[in-house]
Amino acid sequence: MPGQIISIPFLSQNEDMDKYLLEYRSLKLLHQSSNSFQSHNAPSHQSNYHPHYNHMKYNNTGSYYYYNNNNNSSVNPHNQAGLQSINRSIPSAPYGAYNQNRANDVPYMNTQKKHHRFSANNNLNQQKYKQYPQYTSNPMVTAHLKQTYPQLYYNSNVNAHNNNNNSNNNNNNNNNSNNNNNLYNQTQFSTRYFNSNSSPSLTSSTSNSSSPYNQSTFEYILPSTSAASTNLSSSSSNNSMHTNPTTATSTSADLINDLPVGPTSSSLISDLHSPPTVSFLPASQTLLMSSTTSSSIGTNINPPQHSPSPSQREDFSTAPVNMSSSASLLMNDSSLGWGSNHMNVSSSSQPASSRPFGIWNTDMSVWS
């Protein structure tokens, strides 16, 4: 009836699944191995024996003999299971295996074995030295590949057009040598010097030249070692005149003159006593930290105040303070207009502890 649940016993939950899989796999492998050992013409009951015995037994045409209780008897291998041929080897001639009854079978059996051995070896040799047909492609591509990769065509059996191939190879070798010479001549002038001050006539002449290094906006100057004329120096367009390129090499004297002159020992000693200067300032003005100058750099910059004496350092109220002076870094006129920056000069008479600083009052409240 529909909806009924039927329990099908396949595997118990208590059974080990791994054990079942291992047993199944081992049985499957044994079955495959037995099928591989079984010969094609052997019966099923001989599947567990090595094929060498089956091969030995069935290559002997007709009946064969074995020695048993001093009686010579013939046994048909198809009538019995064939265990005698496996367990009992065929004895040699001194034991009377092949006697006068069937003496003519011995050379026949030997010839059959030799023929089978020769045919088997011949088949193996044919399979080993079998030549597969080559891939048919473009003959030009094939010739190019033969020149590029000759080791791939070392065992080639193609003997057609040998004379033509030899002549083509000679021509190709000549072409290759010419190409190599051209490449060598080109690479001699590959290290060229760039000159940004190129003349228009030279630029226009290089655009029409056959040199592989043609550029429309650049000038390439050849090394001084190239005495022969090149496409760059000998080419011309519209009969325009241009100057010959000059070399970029300089003499050793020019190179020494171009080097910067370093300071000597005497100049270093004199520089220690002189005040330091700034490169972006005029030569007559020095740094602010120098105490030897009295001239002001700008209109709003005054000379720095001297530090108070040790007795005055204890009480800042005795120190002179100029709040309107631009020498104070945090409270100058060029800063933002906050709070006591713009206070009166009369407030400078107040002690430093009672004066407000910036936008803050003495009680750390915002100044308004």
Curated annotation (Swiss-Prot):
Coiled coil: none annotated. Residues 183-194, 241-254, 297-311 have a biased composition (Polar residues). Residues 156-213, 228-259, 291-319 are annotated as: Disordered. Residues 156-182, 195-213, 228-240 have a biased composition (Low complexity). This is Uncharacterized protein YBL081W. It comes from Saccharomyces cerevisiae (strain ATCC 204508 / S288c) (Baker's yeast). The lineage of its organism: Eukaryota, Fungi, Dikarya, Ascomycota, Saccharomycotina.
